[in-house]
Structure formats: C-alpha cells, structure tokens
Amino acid sequence: MASIIEKETGHPDERSEIAGVFVRRLQKDMKLQTDPTVIYAIGQQFDGDIRKKDLSIDSPYNTYKVKGLPPTPIAIVGREAIHAALHPKDGKTLYFVAKGDGSHYFSETLAEHNKAVKKYQLK
C-alpha cells in the first residue's frame, strides 16, 4: 500500500487522504484502479501517457482489472508514505483525480468523480 501512495502523490499533505481512499475501496471490495500500478506493469515501454488500452493489460499489477493490492511493492517508499499507510485519513471519499498541478480532487460518489475527471483531465 505504501508504495502505491508514494507513487500516487508528491503532496505530503494528501498521502493520508489517498491512503484512506484505498482502505475504503478495499473494505468495499472495490478495485483500487490506480495508475501507478499500471505504469509499473507497463515497465520500460511506458512513454509518459496512460491510454485507455493500457488499463486493460493483463498483469497482476493492473489494479483496474485485479482486486486487492499488487503482489509486490511498486516502488521504494519514504517514511511519509509508510506513515500514511498506517494512519489513513477517515472519511467517505472513494475517488480522486489529478488536478494537473500535482494535487488531487477527492470525491465521495462516482457521479462527482466523473464531473471532476471532465473538469481536470478532459480539457
């Protein structure tokens, strides 16, 4: 979990909130659906852009297809990511999307998340 948190955000203040999202998704038997695991699965062929086709690759690291955590860490982790994994933020958010400035917008519902995706990703 900590390695995914490490790769998901560079904003230290968001780490525990991202950890909380992942914990709630696992508790609800939802897929994590997090891009860093797909990037890890793509490996050396990753060119900096995730495409829709990438989300369907067969890999135990593809959390868009496989429920639960990947079989191994996907990165070396720092102390802050470990702390966030051990102390996830309480809340109701289940989704987040990158805002383009390194931070994320967090949503409680899929409808709210889809609006945020349109706003921040599909410009």
Regions found by a protein language model. Give the residues of each.
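Bacterial extracytoplasmic/cell-wall-associated proteins, especially those involved in peptidoglycan
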Residues: 1-123
